[in-house]
Amino acid sequence: MRGPPAWPLRLLEPPSPAEPGRLLPVACVWAAASRVPGSLSPFTGLRPARLWGAGPALLWGVGAARRWRSGCRGGGPGASRGVLGLARLLGLWARGPGSCRCGAFAGPGAPRLPRARFPGGPAAAAWAGDEAWRRGPAAPPGDKGRLRPAAAGLPEARKLLGLAYPERRRLAAAVGFLTMSSVISMSAPFFLGKIIDVIYTNPTVDYSDNLTRLCLGLSAVFLCGAAANAIRVYLMQTSGQRIVNRLRTSLFSSILRQEVAFFDKTRTGELINRLSSDTALLGRSVTENLSDGLRAGAQASVGISMMFFVSPNLATFVLSVVPPVSIIAVIYGRYLRKLTKVTQDSLAQATQLAEERIGNVRTVRAFGKEMTEIEKYASKVDHVMQLARKEAFARAGFFGATGLSGNLIVLSVLYKGGLLMGSAHMTVGELSSFLMYAFWVGISIGGLSSFYSELMKGLGAGGRLWELLEREPKLPFNEGVILNEKSFQGALEFKNVHFAYPARPEVPIFQDFSLSIPSGSVTALVGPSGSGKSTVLSLLLRLYDPASGTISLDGHDIRQLNPVWLRSKIGTVSQEPILFSCSIAENIAYGADDPSSVTAEEIQRVAEVANAVAFIRNFPQGFNTVVGEKGVLLSGGQKQRIAIARALLKNPKILLLDEATSALDAENEYLVQEALDRLMDGRTVLVIAHRLSTIKNANMVAVLDQGKITEYGKHEELLSKPNGIYRKLMNKQSFISA
């Protein structure tokens, strides 16, 4: 799948912060002008007119107009007539239809995100598995797998908008309705100005019939604009929800595709924070913010254009202050973007601490460390609060400065407009239209200011997300050779393998490790603790690749095989099986290639073979019993038998087994061992042995010590070596006698 073309997204692309001369930074001026009360300009009565009604607003506006006229010099006779016309305008505006300001301040509510599907189906692969356009370059050879900043490429804003490409038709329709509603809304000041001129220049003419018809016509037009605005909001909100859904699912898919070494170095809490908090923050930038930002941008553009149409001189005078305010806006936006990234990093640390402590609450309770952990978490949250104070201080300074600039600009417009009226370069209707357009532009660019601020915060969080979305896993996910099923035997061989964990490259685990496991045989792997027995199983599953040497399956290097196919042929039962927080039936069905197609009869059959049916039927809900997080509601023996049933349902050719019967009581130990014996029948088995009976029944025993196989043979052969490591382990009673 190729990347999205740029043309449908340019309509949605915000101005770049690197171009201070463009429209966006003007938001600072008019946002503050529309928010900060106390201006003595007459047309600030437009705001109280909406709050208090026409009468008080009209009286207040007339009084302010008179105060303004008394301080105006050189206005001539036009000034007196102008302020009276302005007072009339305030009364008309206060009685105007409320739909004119529909949605000016109150944005749409936060959307609920639909539940994401697990990224395993064809639909997910279409956009998450094969989208080369959203991936960055491959990691360099020296990369250690940590999260790093995304590689330089497309601007992050365009990457963000690239997520909207599948919604291009809905967004294009929304932009069309947005244009319609904006044009209708922004045409009102022009026609109202013409009406004022008619009223002002012909006060004795009976114009009530014409005025009624005109107002009814404008009301119908406003209704059309309101309908278009409602459709625009619906289309933008539903599209935004889909975009966020796609973002979260794509991010989850990218996380699951990473190699295991990545998870060794990246904390789970950090990933959860990115999947929840960062996507929510970025989602607000795309959903709630994008719709209002587009509307505000369209209205601001039309409003500024009409200001130039009404009075180019006055519009040029007003916009001459844009460059210095733009510089302030750019500096503030960049600072806020960096601060947001640092804040999200700190929040991720707090989330990591909480996730780890809550997940291990039994250990915390056993050591009585509740208060200690509370203090640690409070310290992390306090650091987030300190960063929030910095953001609040920056926002206060920014909006305070731009608010002062906005009020000064309003005062300048009144002064300059009065001079133009006095010199007969403007009529009262034109000044009224200009002031109304300025008011609309102030509201619209106020929305753009908020949009810009939220966009910078979203991009700050987005930078963290692109690190994950663009990170290429070092091990292939679903690529490689698939062996012929008919000729597949399951013979395994390690040859001159050297390996160290990527998180600890200075500590070698294997040095010239070699081991051959014939097809259909049972090989017991024994050795002292920490000798690398569990690492052998990890290498066979290709969770890691060796630094040198080869691991082969039926003579094929497993690095050439498809990892998904390879793991589908291998079953595992670990010392401490991990179960999911769902029903017993769902945990058993997890071993199948397609869990949704597994029947209840198949689940019951493998449960019987695993000696699990008896205790399952004792539960009130039977196979529908929920086992709790990591199977915490089950005993060790019960979890072992469910894990064995899960492996039986998978029906693997190769079985990797880490015996864990030493922690079980005699009855559970017998039941688990009997189930394991059934599971091993007819398969190539590599077992980390803890039981003497398993070792005796194994075809071969391999003794692992200091990264090498030091002894290899049958139980009796190894026991006959008086100075051998195996004999020493037996003398220390390292194995269970049963």
Swiss-Prot record:
Changing residue 407 to A: Increased ATPase activity in the absence of biliverdin compared to WT. No increased ATPase activity in the presence of biliverdin. Increased ATPase activity in the absence of biliverdin compared to WT. The lineage of its organism: Eukaryota, Metazoa, Chordata, Craniata, Vertebrata. Ubiquitous. Highly expressed in bone marrow, expressed at intermediate to high levels in skeletal muscle, small intestine, thyroid, heart, brain, placenta, liver, pancreas, prostate, testis, ovary, leukocyte, stomach, spinal cord, lymph node, trachea and adrenal gland, and low levels are found in lung, kidney, spleen, thymus and colon. Homodimer or homooligomer. Interacts with PAAT; this interaction regulates ABCB10. Interacts with SLC25A37; this interaction stabilizes SLC25A37 and enhances the function of SLC25A37 to import mitochondrial iron during erythroid differentiation. Interacts with FECH; this interaction may allow the formation of an oligomeric complex with SLC25A37. Forms a complex with ABCB7 and FECH, where a dimeric FECH bridges ABCB7 and ABCB10 homodimers; this complex may be required for cellular iron homeostasis, mitochondrial function and heme biosynthesis. It is a multi-pass membrane protein. ATP binds at residues 530, 532-535. SMART domains: AAA. GO terms for molecular function: ABC-type transporter activity; ATP binding; ATP hydrolysis activity; metal ion binding; protein homodimerization activity. It is found in: Mitochondrion inner membrane. This is ATP-binding cassette sub-family B member 10, mitochondrial. The gene is ABCB10. Residues 106-168, 237-287, 334-392, 453-738 are mitochondrial matrix. Cholesterol promotes the ATPase activity of ABCB10 in a dose-dependent manner. ATP-dependent transporter located in the mitochondrial inner membrane that catalyzes the export of biliverdin from the mitochondrial matrix, and plays a crucial role in hemoglobin synthesis and antioxidative stress. Participates in the early step of the heme biosynthetic process during insertion of iron into protoporphyrin IX (PPIX). Involved in the stabilization of the iron transporter mitoferrin-1/SLC25A37. In addition may be involved in mitochondrial unfolded protein response (UPRmt) signaling pathway, although ABCB10 probably does not participate in peptide export from mitochondria. Changing residue 582 to G: Does not affect ATPase activity. Activated by Zn (II) mesoporphyrin. Its main location: mitochondrion.
